[in-house]
Amino acid sequence: MKKKGLIITFVVVGFILAFFITIPFVMLNMSIGIDNPGRGPIHIPNGISNHYPQARKWADSLWNAEILKDTFIYNEKGLRMHAFYATAPSQTSKTAIIVHGYTDNATGMLRLGHMYHHHLGYNILLPDLHYSGLSDGDAFQMGWLDRKDVIQWMDTANCIFGKNTQMVVHGISMGAAT
């Protein structure tokens, strides 16, 4: 009788341990290892047209006039990271680095870029984080490792827009975690 109770206890404890060890890995893979709709070829999202029609016209005009430009850096791990940038309409030392959220990319932040560039007169830099847009990587970093890339993008902004740039970093969701 004691032997049977001991075996049942070991089986129950084994199932509980297996559950609590396996489930976190499954959940992590489901949340971070997903296919990223914000990865790949760059396009201006339809959401901008539907919800921010002025931002769409502005983004199209920057695109057509070749004011919105691409740049790339290599981070400390050797991954190629991408960003868009646009110089302000008038000379300024103010720059906004606008960081996207989970499963988004730099073009998804054009609606905020419109506010900073068109209305406030800032230079803008919109990076693609790991595994997003045209940036390398095989998984989201959830903001923790992205923070190092954002610091590197700040240095790059100084090179693009001039030294002693006053910067604001504006992030949404995962981008705010940087």
Language-model segments: residues:
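Short beta-strand element of the alpha/beta-hydrolase
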Residues: 93-101
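Alpha/beta-hydrolase fold nucleophile elbow
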Residues: 161-173
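A short loop-to-beta-strand scaffold at the N-terminal edge of the catalytic core in hydrolase folds
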Residues: 76-87
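N-terminal Sec-pathway targeting helices
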Residues: 1-17
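The serine-hydrolase catalytic nucleophile loop
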Residues: 102-116
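Conserved alpha/beta-hydrolase
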Residues: 116-136
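Alpha/beta-hydrolase active-site loop
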Residues: 140-161
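An N-terminal hydrophobic leader/cap segment in hydrolases
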Residues: 17-73
